[in-house]
Amino acid sequence: MTPVALDIAIHLAKIALIFFVVLTLAAYLVFAERRILAWIQDRKGPNRVGPFGLLQPLADLIKLLTKEDFRPAGADKWLFYLAPAMAAIPAILTFAVIPFGAPLTLFGREVPLQVADLNVGLLFFLALSSIAVYGVALGGWASNSKYALLGSIRGLAQLISYELSMGLSLVPTVMLAGSLRLSDIVAAQEGIWFIVYQPLAFVIFLISIAAECKRIPFDIPEAEGELVAGFHTEYSGMRFGLFFVGEYINIIVLGGLATTFFLGGWHGPWLPPFVWFSAKTLAFAFFFIWMRGTLPRLRYDQLMHLGWKVLTPLALVNILVTGWILMLR
């Protein structure tokens, strides 16, 4: 096999592995959430399909595939069908720039456990997170439903508001690492994780990604008591499943990014690097599930106040303080 063919084969293998692992994790994250919420609420949860209910994600997939693909009268056909894909695909693509382990040596060459080591990896992530907003907007607009439209308007306002604080909270990590490349940011945390230097940025980022995931207490776009199911009210079958899976993939991806920027990525003692990265990422996923089971929903005005009058000003002040400290060094 020629070197070029070998490089292509290695890249395709990494893409296939990430695609399989992320989709499997998303499916079982749904199962884990149902079991954890059941434990919080003092009940059993799904335990009938397979041993300990472990085949429940497969049963859910079969149910979604066999549901009727319903489209409301008056809906914009092509935008209605495009929206679920635009919500799910950017989340998967973001994983391309996340380093999930130390480089391996295969066939006499060093292979990074990362699909694309871009020198603008942070900008790539921010760009894809902006594209995902269009899935929410198109899903509500194309459905010809007042509930869906109101949900998409709320979703747009929320995502745009918290993308700003999320992006600003990452600027100090770039200042400390001196690079936008995610592998360089991980390498800069080999001794001390950035959460030690930037606890405020970490808290701002954590709150912002919870809002980006549209999870309780930030599930304003999908508020069941007000908007039925928000921007995906009119979706059924696998198209609803794409919105659903996209949400859980987003949880995994944003947990991986929080690990990369603040918790040292795959760095850690004793255990293999990939195990460390996975454990940290799944800890964030558990945190999101715990929030859903224990916190109430914010009002819309409280949501906007927190984003624009608290998190964004704090992130700007943190950037100024970090720059001032770096100048004095």
Swiss-Prot record:
What subcellular compartments does it reside in?
A: Cell inner membrane
Keywords (alphabetical) are: Cell inner membrane, Cell membrane, Membrane, NAD, Quinone, Translocase, Transmembrane, Transmembrane helix, Ubiquinone
Per the UniProt entry, the Enzyme Commission number(s) are 7.1.1.-
In terms of InterPro entries, this protein maps to: NADH_UbQ_OxRdtase_su1/FPO, NADH_UbQ_OxRdtase_su1_CS
For molecular function, the Gene Ontology terms on record are: NADH dehydrogenase activity; oxidoreductase activity, acting on NAD(P)H, quinone or similar compound as acceptor; quinone binding
Name the source's superkingdom: Bacteria
Q: How does it sit in the membrane?
A: Multi-pass membrane protein
Reactions this protein catalyses? a quinone + NADH + 5 H(+)(in) = a quinol + NAD(+) + 4 H(+)(out)
The family note in this entry says: Belongs to the complex I subunit 1 family.
Role, per record: NDH-1 shuttles electrons from NADH, via FMN and iron-sulfur (Fe-S) centers, to quinones in the respiratory chain. The immediate electron acceptor for the enzyme in this species is believed to be ubiquinone. Couples the redox reaction to proton translocation (for every two electrons transferred, four hydrogen ions are translocated across the cytoplasmic membrane), and thus conserves the redox energy in a proton gradient. This subunit may bind ubiquinone.
Subunit annotation: NDH-1 is composed of 14 different subunits. Subunits NuoA, H, J, K, L, M, N constitute the membrane sector of the complex.
Q: What is this protein called?
A: NADH-quinone oxidoreductase subunit H 1
From the UniProt record, report the name of the gene that encodes this protein. Answer: nuoH1
